[in-house]
Amino acid sequence: MCYIIFMTKSPFVNKDKIQENQFAFAIYDAFPVSKGHSLIVPKRIVSSVFDLDDEEYNNIFLLVRDVKKILFDKFKPDAFNIGINNGTDAGQTIDHAHIHIIPRYKGDLKDPRGGVRNILPDNTGYIK
């Protein structure tokens, strides 16, 4: 990976890092949906998490686990959502893959059942 290219082309630069490893870093989301909402960002610029090689993919998800522990210790959430918007039609607005870690707190939604299933409101019921 060319560090200079990464530093000039990524919208995630110049952010305080929560944690990092050889393959990715974690930052707080600039537009958080909850206290502690964070992003895991691959150091190699790829549009999709499906473009990561196995070593990157595995180590990035190890970082997800490490950051979850940091967020739990700092913010004491009751649960977490982990999300990836992969492609424009899935809501991806930045052409650099990243993973959302969203701390959840008891009472932040009246009925949190279904979690990520609620991204398509007309299809939130379980298929019978």
Question: How does the language model describe each region?
Answer:
Residues 1-128:
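HIT superfamily nucleotide-processing domains
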